């Protein structure tokens, strides 16, 4: 009877240790996933900021082109 308690205790201890390792591995994987996602978010944020600058430049150029066209139309009407 004493031996079966020792074996049972060893099985329980081994299970607890294996479960702890599994949890640490999962935690490490999740931590790495979060870091990867944060890096991707930072990159996307930088991309969005660059695109915003390009959009503003395109709007400014379109406004200048429209102004030139308006000036040409006015000169033909005279």
Swiss-Prot record:
Domain of life: Bacteria
Subunit structure: Homotrimer.
Signal peptide: 1-20
Function field: A highly abundant outer membrane lipoprotein that controls the distance between the inner and outer membranes. The only protein known to be covalently linked to the peptidoglycan network (PGN). Also non-covalently binds the PGN. The link between the cell outer membrane and PGN contributes to maintenance of the structural and functional integrity of the cell envelope, and maintains the correct distance between the PGN and the outer membrane.
Gene designation per UniProt: lpp
KW Membrane (keyword) present: yes
Pfam family, one: LPP
Name of the featured protein: Major outer membrane lipoprotein Lpp
């Amino acid at each position: 009877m004493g031996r079966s308690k020792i074996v049972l205790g060893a099985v329980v201890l081994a299970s607890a240790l294996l479960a702890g390792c599994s949890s640490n591995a999962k935690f490490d994987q999740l931590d790495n996933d979060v870091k990867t996602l944060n890096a991707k978010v930072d990159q996307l944020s930088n991309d969005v900021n660059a695109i915003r600058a390009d959009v503003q430049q395109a709007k400014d150029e379109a406004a200048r082109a429209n102004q030139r066209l308006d000036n040409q139309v006015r000169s033909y009407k005279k």
